[in-house]
Every structure is written in C-alpha cells, then in structure tokens.
Amino acid sequence: MGMLARVALGLIIIDAVLAAPTTELFNYDSEVYDAILEDTGTFYNYEHIPDNHVENEKVSERLSGNRELLTPGPQLGDNQDEDKDEESTPRLIDGSSPQEPEFPGLLGPHTNEDFPTCLLCTCISTTVYCDDHELDAIPPLPKKTTYFYSRFNRIKKINKNDFASLNDLKRIDLTSNLISEIDEDAFRKLPHLQELVLRDNKIKQLPELPNTLTFIDISNNRLGRKGIKQEAFKDMYDLHHLYITDNSLDHIPLPLPESLRALHLQNNDILEMHEDTFCNVKNLTYVRKALEDIRLDGNPINLSRTPQAYMCLPRLPIGSFI
C-alpha cells in the first residue's frame, strides 16, 4: 500500500508540473522579432535584467496575488484626512513590490507633480518601468538608471535634458507613444546606450545617435525621405539589428556597418538597390557573412533586376523577384 501511495503522489506532482503555465520573455534579438510583435498582445515581459531581479519580481507577484499594489496606509489612527491623502496617492500598476532602489533617496527624484518617480512608476534595482501610466513627458529618472521602459503613454517630445547625466543607461524603450519631436542631443551623449526602441510613434526626424548602439527599432514612424541623416549608422561598429519598417522610406540608408545581422525595411517605398548596397563590386570574392536577415517585402522594388547587389550575402533578401 505504501508503494502505491508514493506512485500516486508522484503522478499528481508530475501532472501539476505539466499543467503549470510557461513564461516566455520578450526577445529583442530574435530573428522573428516582427512576428513576435504581431502575436504579442502586451509588452510586460522584460529581458536583460539580472536574474535575481526577475526572481524577486516573480516572488513578490506570488506573494501579492494582486496586480494593483497600494501604498501603505497610515500607521496610527483612522483620521479621515489621512485616508483622503492615502486615496490621492498614485497606485503602482505592477505585480511586484517596490524594493528599495539602488539610488540616492528611497523613491528617486520627484516629478513635476511632486510625486517620487519610483512611486509613480516601478523601480526594481536600476530598472524603471513606467508603462501605461498616461505620462505626457519623461519623468525625472534616478541617476543610476540602466533600463528605462515607458511604453503605451502619451509622451509627445523628448527633450535634451530628459536623459542628461544618465551615464549608465543601456536601454530606452518608448514604444507606442505620441512622440513627434526629439531634441538633437537627446541621446547622443549617452556613453553606454546599447538598445533604442522608438517604434509606433510619429517621429519625422531622427536625431544623431550614439555609436554604441547595438539594436535600433524605429519602425512605424513618419521618417519619409529626409528623416534619417546621411551616414547615420556608418560608425556604429557594434550595430546588430536595425528595424525601420513602415516609414515611407524611398531608399536604403547607407552605408551600413559590417556588424549588421538583421535589416528590416518592409512596407516602405524603396524602388531600387545598387550593386554596392551590400557588396563590394571591386572585390568579387568578398562575402558579407554577418548580414543574414534582410526584409524588403512590401516595397515596390524588383530584386531580380540587380542580382549582383546580393551575391555576397549568405541568404537572399526577402522581397519581390517579379
């Protein structure tokens, strides 16, 4: 009987494990990045955060069991004025508890409404999440901020001082705002910025960017014919992924760094490609090994007219050959 009981218990445990939902983190570097964006209804999965921070967040979610985390109530008494003040305090829209951030000041700098940024948003170590908070401007960020997410807000402009002196910033994600204007020095002086995501906005002119970038997504904006400066990406020697889909571009922004692995330009107005766009016409043995993912589908270009333009590539571009 004891053996049967242990077998039954083992089967119950295995069944519970198999029934548990899996968690997939959003991967910026995926080869099917665009497909993931189409299939993903929310952007609340984060990556490149130290494992212990992610684990802390998951633990606090299990403990809270509630998406809305209210600020602590008054310690003594039940004075009505104190209750009213408590009700007027913004809620943290996140499942994680606000741990003590690694910044000067417990809750970081204050916004224009005199709320601490880490109370209005959610700070986990050096990562700041301000997603879906109806913000109309970049909040003042703690000086040690490394990753900043402010997606699905109403931000219209990025000022040159919004990220000033934030020398540790590695990622900025401002997906799905109303951004139409960016000051020229908004990003250029950030010494360690690696990933910049500005997709789904109204940007008409891309400012000068730091050469440290490895990942750029400016898809679904309004860059048009003149929105990208000449040789904008030339000196980005570590740039791996460049996404400029749905922008009414009529040309491929050249030159592109040798480090580039993925170039997505679908759904633009590109009409032609030159033989030296990707290859070296003076060196017929040249092979561009890194660039394996080129998307030109949704453009009026006929790729069959310039076969020499991609003879050096490991894979044919995706697009029309008719």
Curated annotation (Swiss-Prot):
Keywords: Disulfide bond, Extracellular matrix, Glycoprotein, Leucine-rich repeat, Proteoglycan, Repeat, Secreted, Signal. SUPFAM superfamilies: L domain-like. Residues 106-143 form the LRRNT domain. Residues 1-19 form the signal peptide. Glycans are attached at S64, S96, N283, N302. Pfam families: LRR_8, LRRNT. One of its GO terms (biological process) is articular cartilage development. Residues 58-108 are annotated as: Disordered. LRR repeats lie at residues 144-165, 168-189, 192-213, 238-258, 259-280, 290-310. The keyword Cytoplasm does not apply. It is found in: Secreted, Extracellular space, Extracellular matrix. GO terms for cellular component: extracellular matrix; extracellular region. The O-linked polysaccharide on Ser-96 is probably the mucin type linked to GalNAc. There is one glycosaminoglycan chain, known to be dermatan sulfate, and it is probably the O-glycosylation at Ser-64. Gene3D superfamilies: Ribonuclease Inhibitor. Disulfide bonds join C118-C130, C279-C312. Belongs to the small leucine-rich proteoglycan (SLRP) family. SLRP class III subfamily. This is Epiphycan. It comes from Mus musculus (Mouse).
